[in-house]
């Protein structure tokens, strides 16, 4: 029960970090990583508490996807800092018409 509270608080902190910290792109990426880590820990503990050893491949897939997400996010941050010379989210105008 205590682990569930820790996992939910990690997820909540990551979500609040994304909603409240919209100034820098790196802080948004870190909050996304916190969301993924809390999701991974939650799924891993659920699998072990229910004695489901077959879902370890799902855990590895989730870790692989989070590593890909981190590398793509960091490459976007490098491209952003090279073109706009900062990592401010306000300097992004790619989605505006």
UniProtKB/Swiss-Prot annotation:
Its main location: mitochondrion. One of its GO terms (cellular component) is mitochondrial membrane. It is a multi-pass membrane protein. It is found in: Mitochondrion membrane. Keywords: Electron transport, Membrane, Mitochondrion, NAD, Respiratory chain, Translocase, Transmembrane, Transmembrane helix, Transport, Ubiquinone. Its EC number is 7.1.1.2. It catalyses: a ubiquinone + NADH + 5 H(+)(in) = a ubiquinol + NAD(+) + 4 H(+)(out). Pfam families: Oxidored_q2 (PF00420). Gene3D superfamilies: 1.10.287.3510. GO terms for molecular function: NADH dehydrogenase (ubiquinone) activity. GO terms for biological process: ATP synthesis coupled electron transport. The chain crosses the membrane at residues 1-21, 23-43, 60-80. The keyword Metal-binding does not apply. Core subunit of the mitochondrial membrane respiratory chain NADH dehydrogenase (Complex I) that is believed to belong to the minimal assembly required for catalysis. Complex I functions in the transfer of electrons from NADH to the respiratory chain. The immediate electron acceptor for the enzyme is believed to be ubiquinone. Belongs to the complex I subunit 4L family. This is NADH-ubiquinone oxidoreductase chain 4L. It comes from Paracentrotus lividus (Common sea urchin). The lineage of its organism: Eukaryota, Metazoa, Echinodermata, Eleutherozoa, Echinozoa.
